[in-house]
């Protein structure tokens, strides 16, 4: 029995919206691309950039941590990935609209906004992930203590739930916003803040300018198709990430022993992911703004996040699989229940 036995298909509306985004994006691309064939290649590139950006390390860590938090509160997290990606991609869309009405302004000011926005977005992402990592570290210690207590004495499931939910009290130390995330849609503003780094927005915007034609070479619908396709690709994988993590975590909520056992495993991964990614982001900003040199800072600056997100996805899924196998063949539930 899962936590959300009556909400098995709660993810369907989000998938339907993602499909609608695909239909709109590719329809706009087809309409505008009939007159400018080069737009087809640009549209596919925009969609690919969206797919790739969904695997950014900060996306994966933020979505998976929020899914786990909502499940602990017995809230449905099916839309976490969807709303995060919509908030993030809305920055791209707004930038494309501005480009559509004022191409010259974008050409003159975009580099400046890219620098400022990139700093803001990275700082928000880094601080948020470090705070989440510290919170999860405290949670991990409490879980280990609770698991040891469960081996020594019998604990009712209601008591376990109360202990798990009481960990939320720690959230008062990490600022007011994370406490306010009690529904899937609450992560939409967070996704927007993460998106304020105009690196991805500028990629899509510059695609609209890369044809080398005059300002009227690509229609407004053609320009709009690029951020919509970008959002389609990113929302597809982010939504699937949130849904997959929901059902992976639901395995852990079958009984008290399994619940604590799995939470120890996945929380340890969450701590590592959030702290490592958050600290690297903040250290890279520090090194850049203070012009720091040396072997350590050179190593920090050389770290690329392009493949780290893929590793995190695999790590979460492998952790869930290994936990299931150890649980089954190690007979942990039987040993702890005696």
From Swiss-Prot:
GO terms for biological process: nickel cation import across plasma membrane. It holds the Pfam family NicO. The keyword Transmembrane applies. NCBIfam families: nico (TIGR00802). One of its GO terms (molecular function) is high-affinity nickel cation transmembrane transporter activity. Signal peptide: none annotated. The keyword Oxidoreductase does not apply. InterPro entries: Ni/Co_transpt, Ni/Co_transpt_high_affinity. This is Nickel transporter NixA. GO terms for cellular component: plasma membrane. It is found in: Cell membrane. It comes from the Bacteria. The chain crosses the membrane at residues 11-31, 37-57, 79-99, 127-147, 187-207, 217-237, 266-286, 307-327. It is a multi-pass membrane protein. The gene is nixA. Secondary nickel transporter. Required for full urease activity. Disruption phenotype: Deletion mutant is impaired in its capacity to accumulate nickel. Nickel accumulation and urease activity are almost completely abolished in a nixA-nikA double mutant. Keywords: Cell membrane, Ion transport, Membrane, Nickel, Nickel transport, Transmembrane, Transmembrane helix, Transport. Belongs to the NiCoT transporter (TC 2.A.52) family. Its main location: membrane. Induction: Transiently induced in response to mild-acid conditions.
């Amino acid at each position: 029995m899962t936590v959300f036995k009556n909400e098995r298909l709660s993810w369907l509306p989000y998938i339907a919206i993602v499909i609608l985004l695909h239909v709109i994006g590719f329809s706009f691309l087809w309409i505008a691309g009939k007159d400018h064939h080069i737009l087809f290649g640009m549209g596919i590139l925009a969609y690919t950039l969206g797919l790739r950006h969904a695997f950014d390390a900060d996306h994966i860590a933020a979505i998976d941590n929020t899914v786990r938090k909502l499940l602990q509160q017995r809230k449905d997290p099916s839309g976490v990935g969807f709303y995060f990606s919509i908030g993030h991609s809305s920055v791209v869309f707004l930038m494309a609209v501005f480009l559509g009405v004022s191409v010259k302004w974008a050409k003159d000011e975009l580099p400046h906004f890219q620098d400022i926005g990139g700093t803001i977005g990275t700082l928000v992402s880094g601080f948020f992930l470090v705070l989440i990592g510290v919170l999860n570290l405290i949670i991990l210690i409490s879980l280990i203590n609770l698991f040891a207590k469960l081996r020594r004495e019998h604990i009712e499931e209601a008591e376990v739930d109360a202990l798990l939910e009481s960990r939320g009290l720690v959230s008062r130390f990490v600022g007011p916003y994370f406490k306010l995330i009690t529904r899937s849609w609450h992560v939409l503003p967070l996704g927007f803040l993460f998106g304020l780094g105009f690196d991805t927005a500028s990629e899509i915007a510059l695609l609209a300018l890369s044809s080398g034609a005059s300002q009227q070479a690509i229609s407004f619908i053609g320009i709009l198709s690029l951020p919509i396709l970008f959002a389609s690709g990113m929302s597809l994988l982010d939504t699937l990430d949130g849904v997959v993590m929901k059902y992976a975590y639901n395995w852990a909520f079958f009984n008290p022993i399994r619940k604590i056992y799995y939470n120890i495993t996945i929380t340890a991964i969450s701590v590592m992911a959030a702290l490592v990614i958050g600290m690297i982001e903040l250290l890279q900003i520090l090194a850049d703004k203070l012009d720091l040199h040396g072997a350590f800072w050179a190593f920090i600056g050389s770290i690329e996040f392009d493949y780290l997100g893929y590793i995190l996805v695999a790590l979460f899924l492998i952790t869930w699989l290994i936990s299931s196998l150890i649980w089954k063949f190690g007979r942990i539930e039987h040993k702890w229940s005696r």
